[in-house]
């Protein structure tokens, strides 16, 4: 595990590296329930493909990937990233996965999102961070972190024999700075 880079009362974020590989991490990526709201659910992840991803992730200049660890015991419970960073437009997409099911609904995701949004605006000088999701719990988590609804991509996701809308949300730096105390 890399040293802690960002932390809150609940979680710490560290750069995601090959040392983060574990059987439990691999199992998350292949767990149908964990990936219910992910496109990756249709493609099996092998040990080799995960290790390759972890080796190569630091070579990408348009994304930053972090492991999410519970602060109390530093157990790796998920990952969070800013990806598709457009440096000129100063915007990025946010991605998050809480793979440890025992950590669901306990505020870890909300806390990790708060940390990475603050990092994106204060350290990377971004102006906009956006997401697309059709996970109702994720929508609530993003709303808690000042994300605003911007639109819907109708019937974009096909899962379990039905189409689902993809909710588009974003937070702007100006809105973030109005509500936080630095």
What are these language model-derived features?
Residues 45-102, 172:
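Acetyl-CoA-dependent GNAT
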Residues 122-133:
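Conserved GNAT acetyl-CoA-binding A-motif
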Residues 1-51, 175-182:
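A short, well-structured alpha-helix characteristic of acyl/acetyltransferase catalytic modules
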Residues 105-119, 139-144:
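Conserved acetyl-CoA-binding loop-helix of GNAT-fold acetyltransferases
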Residues 130-132, 148-164:
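Conserved catalytic-core motifs of GNAT/GCN5-like acyltransferases
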Residues 142-147, 169:
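Conserved active-site tyrosine of GNAT-family acetyltransferases
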Residues 74, 107, 161:
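Conserved G/P- and acidic residue-centered "switch" motifs that form tight phosphate/ATP-binding loops
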């Amino acid at each position: 595990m890399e040293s802690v880079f960002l932390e809150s009362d609940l979680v710490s974020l560290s750069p995601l590296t090959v040392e983060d590989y574990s059987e439990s991490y691999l199992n998350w990526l292949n767990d149908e329930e964990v990936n219910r709201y992910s496109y990756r659910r249709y493609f099996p992840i092998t040990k080799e493909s995960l290790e390759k991803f972890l080796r190569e992730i630091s070579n990408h200049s348009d994304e930053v990937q972090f492991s999410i660890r519970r602060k109390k015991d530093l157990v790796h419970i998920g990952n969070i990233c800013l990806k598709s960073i457009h440096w000129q437009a100063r915007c990025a997409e946010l991605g998050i996965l809480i793979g440890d099911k025992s950590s669901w609904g306990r505020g870890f995701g909300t806390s990790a999102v708060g940390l990475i949004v603050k990092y994106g605006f204060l350290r990377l000088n971004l102006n906009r961070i956006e997401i697309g999701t059709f996970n109702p719990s994720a929508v609530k988590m993003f709303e808690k972190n000042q994300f605003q609804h911007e639109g819907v991509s109708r019937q974009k996701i096909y899962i379990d024999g039905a189409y689902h809308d993809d909710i588009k949300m974003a937070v702007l730096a100006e809105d973030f700075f109005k509500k936080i105390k630095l």
